[in-house]
């Protein structure tokens, strides 16, 4: 009788050790940026500022109804904007990341609408999409922590 009881106690001890070793403590989500994270994000700041000024140049092309240059400008000087925004999104805090990704997708949806409307010479649609794109980009820039 002692043998099964000892065996049962040994099995319970192994099972408890296994369960404790497999359990995990819930990881805390960081609520503030570390100095290294801010430094990494700030490396993108000049590039994002340049892209913001390029958005103003796009507005000038739209205002002048220069459709060919508008389409070319979207695919040329603004071509790297998506990659930069995605890289920045990945470095933000988790609570800001999803919003940044959504704003990036929205901005590029707006640029596609501008592209299509410019090809169709639809000034009203181009200007509406441009204003929405600028708003999305400004909202994205608000997510970037200040140094």
Model-inferred region functions:
Residues 52-62, 82-89, 111-118, 137-144:
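A structural signal for well-ordered alpha-helices, especially hydrophobic packing surfaces
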Residues 81-101:
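Short, solvent-exposed, charged loop/turn and helix-capping segments
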Residues 23-72:
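Immediate post-signal-peptide N-terminus of mature secreted/exported proteins
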Residues 1-11:
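Bacterial N-terminal signal peptides that target proteins for export
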Residues 121, 127-147:
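C-terminal partner/receptor-binding element of secreted or periplasmic proteins
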Residues 71-76, 97-105, 124-134:
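Short, charged, amphipathic alpha-helical segments
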Residues 18-21:
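C-terminal motif of bacterial Sec signal peptides marking the signal peptidase cleavage site
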